[in-house]
């Protein structure tokens, strides 16, 4: 049913227009801020509705024609109909709003956004595979939007052109395998001049399958890696391909090798800009000792080691820290780097003190954030704490949560923050924030007030528990 005309006020990070009707929020798929649209309601909830655009009556000046013919069906992109600079502005607003709503803080300065290529930027991707006879056989691509179905993709403009051109040949190749229905996914990882494809196969491959893979690799100049079970089972079909994937950071003289299933940034161009900005914001001095928490393969640790006295990388996986150490040695940085393997989701202040004093700190956690690290930092005395911290985030909500701890309990100031457009045309918000410690007496005051507040909250909770227990013992 087509509803009355809706006026779109804003946009959420799923690229849904937000309108209001009779006091209820309406999320309108396909609409942009400032537009007047006819929309069909597709779902009604007590506090909100979801609708779909039927007709755009007054188009936004920010509306553009999506480049991809699959846009709107494929779930890989959500914002191709919105002009790229407007996409970034929406992400910046979302970041600032989240800081305030979650943490009751605002950055003193908004950093200019980091921009990079908006098309052909995805150097990593996970493509699902399904055998669907009704759609002509095998499908290879991203999931449909909000669905477990695989989109019928024939091209993809956020993948590099040569990878997009593989989508149809991959369909034919998988169809030629002995058990195509037992191939659930293919991961794509690109290095400089190298394209690696990781084939997830639930059942063992036979000689015929191996021949098909080798023929495809020779015809399309790709490497095949095979994965029969978990990540530890990944290995190259050709052993000579074991250490050929890499990305470079020429401004630091670094070449970073990695395996196709390792975590590396999707957008190599933005990664270089991000690392450069992080180091500039940290203001590392030649005498500084710097910590890099959640260091992974050393994406920040090795550049930090080129500028400071010592860079200490900490990561939960020993396999990653071992390889980061190998990369450091390959560049002659073993004397200026150290790596530790620790679960950073369970650290406390005594662990942090055990690592020694750091002049600067970089934190780059996964989506879960760095809650335990933020709590430990907030308990350090003025003499023990890093004076400046840069936090790189892929989740505004956990960044705001951790920032609130550092500011309201630890005596840090949120000096600056801004977005990194790592994933153009999606709602994903990557960001970077800079924290600086207050003066020593101000830090002590903030920490004391936080302790008093926590003690009062604990006392009130205990009293409420006693009262609830007493009430439950009263006769009916």
Curated annotation (Swiss-Prot):
InterPro entries associated with the record: 23S_rRNA_MeTrfase_RlmD (IPR001566), MeTrfase_TrmA_AS (IPR030390), MeTrfase_TrmA_CS (IPR030391), NA-bd_OB-fold (IPR012340), SAM-dependent_MTases_sf (IPR029063), TRAM_dom (IPR002792), U5_MeTrfase_fam (IPR010280)
GO biological process: rRNA base methylation
Location of the active site: 394
Keyword terms, alphabetized: 4Fe-4S, Iron, Iron-sulfur, Metal-binding, Methyltransferase, rRNA processing, S-adenosyl-L-methionine, Transferase
Binding site for [4Fe-4S] cluster: 68, 74, 77, 156
Gene3D superfamilies: 2.40.50.1070, Nucleic acid-binding proteins, Vaccinia Virus protein VP39
Catalytic activity: uridine(1939) in 23S rRNA + S-adenosyl-L-methionine = 5-methyluridine(1939) in 23S rRNA + S-adenosyl-L-homocysteine + H(+)
Reported function: Catalyzes the formation of 5-methyl-uridine at position 1939 (m5U1939) in 23S rRNA.
Name of this chain's protein: 23S rRNA (uracil(1939)-C(5))-methyltransferase RlmD
Organism per entry: Bordetella avium (strain 197N)
């Amino acid at each position: 049913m087509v509803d009355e005309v809706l006026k779109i006020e804003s946009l959420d990070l799923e690229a849904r227009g937000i309108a209001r009707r009779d006091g209820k929020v309406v999320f309108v798929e396909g609409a942009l801020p400032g537009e007047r649209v006819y929309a069909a309601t597709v779902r009604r909830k007590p506090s909100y509705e979801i609708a779909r655009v039927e007709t755009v009556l007054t188009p936004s000046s920010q509306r553009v024609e999506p480049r991809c013919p699959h846009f709107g069906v494929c779930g890989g992109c959500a914002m191709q109909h919105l002009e790229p600079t407007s996409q970034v502005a929406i992400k910046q607003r979302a970041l600032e709003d989240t800081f305030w709503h979650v943490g009751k803080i605002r950055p003193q300065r908004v950093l200019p956004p980091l921009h990079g290529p908006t098309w052909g930027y995805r150097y990593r991707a996970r493509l699902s595979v399904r055998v669907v006879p009704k759609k002509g056989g095998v499908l290879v691509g991203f999931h449909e939007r909000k669905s477990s179905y695989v989109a019928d993709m024939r091209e993809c403009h956020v993948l590099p052109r040569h990878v997009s051109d593989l989508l149809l040949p991959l369909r034919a190749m998988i169809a030629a395998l002995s058990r195509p229905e037992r191939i659930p996914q293919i991961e794509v990882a690109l290095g400089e001049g190298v394209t690696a494809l990781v084939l997830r196969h639930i059942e063992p491959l036979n000689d015929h399958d191996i021949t098909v893979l080798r023929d495809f690799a020779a015809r399309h100049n790709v490497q095949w890696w095979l994965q029969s079970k978990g990540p530890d089972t990944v290995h190259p079909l050709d052993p000579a391909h074991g250490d050929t994937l890499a990305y470079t950071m020429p401004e630091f003289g670094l070449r970073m090798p990695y395996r196709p299933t390792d975590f590396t940034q999707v957008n190599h161009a933005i990664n270089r800009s991000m690392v450069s900005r992080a180091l500039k914001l940290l203001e590392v001095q030649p005498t500084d000792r710097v910590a890099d928490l959640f260091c992974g393969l050393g994406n920040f640790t090795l550049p930090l080691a080129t500028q400071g006295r010592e860079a200490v990388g900490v990561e939960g996986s020993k396999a990653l820290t071992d390889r980061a150490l190998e990369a450091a040695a390959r560049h002659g940085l073993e004397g200026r780097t150290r790596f530790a393997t620790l679960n950073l989701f369970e650290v406390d202040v005594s662990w942090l003190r055990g690592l020694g004093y750091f002049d600067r700190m970089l934190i780059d956690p996964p989506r879960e954030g760095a809650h335990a690290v933020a709590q430990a930092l907030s308990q350090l005395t003025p003499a023990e704490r890093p004076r400046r911290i840069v936090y790189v985030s892929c989740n505004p909500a956990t960044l705001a949560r951790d920032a609130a701890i550092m500011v309201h309990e630890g005596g840090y100031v949120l000096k600056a923050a801004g977005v990194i457009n790592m994933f153009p045309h999606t709602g994903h918000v990557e960001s970077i924030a800079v924290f600086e410690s207050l003066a020593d007496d101000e830090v002590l005051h903030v920490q004391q007030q936080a302790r008093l507040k926590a003690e009062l909250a604990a006392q009130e909770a205990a009293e409420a528990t006693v009262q609830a227990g007493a009430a439950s013992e009263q006769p009916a």
